[in-house]
C-alpha cells in the first residue's frame, strides 16, 4: 500500500487501493486540509499585511471547501464512520446541557 503519512511518500501505486486504503487516504486528506487551514490562519494572525490576509483568507476558504467535500465523500463511502461522528456531536451537546442523552438513558 502507498504510504500517506507524508506528501513525499505519495506515489502512483502498482495496483488499485483497497477500500480500506482509500478510506485511510481520504482521512489523511481531511487532516491535511485542516492542518493547512490552521497554518494559514496563524500566518494571517501574525501579520498586518492586508495583501497576505486577503489571499490567505481566500485560500483558507478553499481549504474549508476541500475539507467539506472530503468529509462528504467519507460519509458516502463509510456511513458507519459518519454515525460515530454524529454520536460524538450529540454526546458533546448533552455534556454541555444543550441536548438529550445520545445513549437514551438518564445518566
Regions from the PLM with identified roles:
Residues 1-107:
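Iron-associated oxidoreductase/ferritin-like identity signal
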